[in-house]
Amino acid sequence: MTVLLLVVLQMWKATAGHSIAVSQDDGADDWETDPDFVNDVSEKEQRWGAKTVKGSGHQEHINIHQLRENVFQEHQTIKEKELETGPKASHGYGGKFGVEQDRMDKSAVGHEYQSKLSKHCSQVDSVKGFGGKFGVQTDRVDQSAVGFEYQGKTEKHASQKDYSSGFGGKYGVQADRVDKSAVGFDYQGKTEKHESQKDYSKGFGGKYGVDKDKVDKSAVGFEYQGKTEKHESQKDYVKGFGGKFGVQTDRQDKCALGWDHQEKVQLHESQKDYKSGFGGKFGVQTERQDPSAVGFDYKEKLAKHESQQDYSKGFGGKYGVQKDRMDKNAATFEDIEKPTSTYQKTKPVERVANKTSSIRANLENLAKEKEQEDRRKAEAERAQRMAREKQEQEEARRKLEEQAKAKKQTPPPSPTTQPAEPKTPSSPVYQDAVSYDAESAYKNSSTTYSAEHEPESGYKTTGSDYQEAVSQREAEYEPETVYEVAGAGDHYQAEENTYDEYENELGITAIALYDYQAAGDDEISFDPDDIITNIEMIDDGWWRGVCKGRYGLFPANYVELRQ
C-alpha cells in the first residue's frame, strides 16, 4: 500500500504545472470508405501487387522485358544523335573513301608505312666519330675526342704569370701593349668645373646670342609665336570625306563609303558551285581539277609484300655486277679481313726434374741437335749445287764461243778430204744446228767441184757468202741453244734422292695453327707456325709427333698437314 502511494505521489509531482489539452476532431474519419470507390482489383492482383492503386501507395510490379526494350531504344537514339552531331572519325583519314589526300591526317599512316627501327647496341658501329675502323679518317673524328699525341696546356699558376703585360712590357716601353686604363706619371687629370664657373650661355646662341649654330633646338626666343590647338567647335571634320562639298576624292578617307557603294553579299551555301576543283561542270577542265581528287580510272599502287621485294638493290644488282649501285658498307666475299693476332708466347711451367725427365730431356736434346744438323747439311748441299750449276753453265758458254771462233777461222773443206763424223752433242737443239751446218757445207763443196774451171774471184765470192750464211745461222740458233753437261743428270738425280730420303726421315709434317700447352707428361707444347714432324695418326682427335725436340701427343685440330 505504501508503495502504491509513493508511485501516485511521483506521478502527481511530474504532472504538476503542465496543462494537457486533447483536441477532438468531429470531421470524417481517414479510414472511411469513398462512396464512389469501385474495387476492381482481383484477388491475384491484390495478393501479388500486379496493379497500381492510386492513393494506396502500392505500385505495380516491373516488367523486365519492357524495361530492357525501352532502354535499348533510348540508347540507339542517343548514339544516332552523337554520330550526326559529333566529330566524324573519317575526317583526317582521307574522307569517306580514303581518297581525299588533302584532308588526311599527317600522323595517319597506311599499310605501306614501314617504320625504321633503331639498331641494337650490338649492331651499332661505335667507331664512328673516332676516325673510322682504323682511326685514319680524320674527317669523321669527334671534335671532343683527343688522341695520344694530344698535349693539354694547363693554365699557369698565379706565381708564374707575368703581370707586367698590359703596363708597357717589362720595362714600360712597349706602348702598343700598355693598358688603356693604366696611366703614367705624366698623366694630368682634368677636374670638372664648379657650378659657379660654368658658362650657361652655351646653347642659347653663345655669349651674345648671335651664334646660330650653337643655339639649342628646344630654346626659343622672344619672336617665337606658339600656335595653340583649335577648340573642338572650330575643327573642320569634313576632311577625309571629300572636303567641304565631297568632291575632293584625293582627300577622301579610304574607309568612307558613299551612297553609290553596293556591298557584295557572300553567296549562301546552296548557291555556291562546289564543282570547282573537280574538273568543272562536266569534269573535263583538268587545270581546275583538285590534285587530291581521283577518278574511277585511278589505280592505287599497293606496297609489295616482304616476299616480293627485291632486296638485291644496294648490293650490286641481281647478279652483283653493278658496282655503281653497290652499297658502300656492303662487303664482298673477296674483301676478307685478316685477323690481327695479339698473341704472346706463354712460357710453359717446367715440372720438377727427376731421373726420368732428365733422361728424356737428354734424348730430346739429341734429337733436336740431329734435326738442326740435318737442316744445316741440306742448306750447305743446296748452296754447293747452285755454285756447280753456275760454273758448268759458264764453261759451256765459253766452249761454244771458242767453237764459233774456230769455225770462222777455218777455210772451206777441200774436195779430197772426207767429211769427219761430227761429235754427237747432248743437246738436241745443238745437234740440229750442227747437222744443218754440215749439210750446207756439203752443198757448197759440190758447188766448188762444178766451178773448178771458173776464175779464182768466183771462188772467193762463194767462200765469203758461205761464211756470212754460217754466221747468220749461228746468230739465229745461239740464244735458243740448250746445254747439258755429261754426268750432270746423274748428279741431280742423286741429290734428289738425298732430299727424298731426308723428307722420308721427317715423315708426315704439319704446321701449328694455334698455341698449345702440354697438360701431361706424355703431351708436347707448341706455338703458332711451329713445325711438327714424324706424325703418327693414332686417333681422329689426337696425334703423336716431334716438336722442339720433344715427342708426345697433341690435338689434331690445332695443326694443318703440309703437302
Curated annotation (Swiss-Prot):
The keyword Membrane applies. Residues 331-477 are annotated as: Disordered. One of its GO terms (molecular function) is actin filament binding. Acetylated. In normal cells, appears to be phosphorylated on serine and threonine; in cells expressing activated forms of pp60-src, they become heavily phosphorylated on tyrosine in vitro. Tyrosine phosphorylation in transformed cells may contribute to cellular growth regulation and transformation. GO terms for biological process: actin cytoskeleton organization; cell migration; cell motility; focal adhesion assembly; intracellular protein transport; lamellipodium organization; neuron projection morphogenesis; positive regulation of actin filament polymerization. Keywords: Cell junction, Cell membrane, Cell projection, Coated pit, Coiled coil, Cytoplasm, Cytoskeleton, Endocytosis, Endoplasmic reticulum, Membrane, Phosphoprotein, Repeat, SH3 domain, Synapse. The keyword DNA-binding does not apply. InterPro entries: Cortactin_SH3 (IPR035716), Hs1_Cortactin (IPR003134), SH3-like_dom_sf (IPR036028), SH3_domain (IPR001452). Its main location: cytoplasm. Residues 366-405 have a biased composition (Basic and acidic residues). Residues 349-410 form a coiled coil. It is found in: Cytoplasm, Cytoskeleton; Cell projection, Lamellipodium; Cell projection, Ruffle; Cell projection, Dendrite. One of its GO terms (cellular component) is endoplasmic reticulum. Pfam families: HS1_rep (PF02218), SH3_9 (PF14604). SMART domains: SH3. Cortactin repeats lie at residues 89-125, 126-162, 163-199, 200-236, 237-273, 274-310, 311-333. Gene3D superfamilies: SH3 Domains. Residues 505-563 form the SH3 domain. Contributes to the organization of the actin cytoskeleton and cell shape. Plays a role in the formation of lamellipodia and in cell migration. Plays a role in the regulation of neuron morphology, axon growth and formation of neuronal growth cones, and may play a role in the regulation of neuronal spine density. Plays a role in focal adhesion assembly and turnover. Plays a role in intracellular protein transport and endocytosis, and in modulating the levels of potassium channels present at the cell membrane. Plays a role in endocytosis via clathrin-coated pits. PANTHER family: CORTACTIN AND DREBRIN (PTHR10829), SRC SUBSTRATE CORTACTIN (PTHR10829:SF15). The SH3 motif may mediate binding to the cytoskeleton. This is Src substrate protein p85. It comes from Gallus gallus. The lineage of its organism: Eukaryota, Metazoa, Chordata, Craniata, Vertebrata.
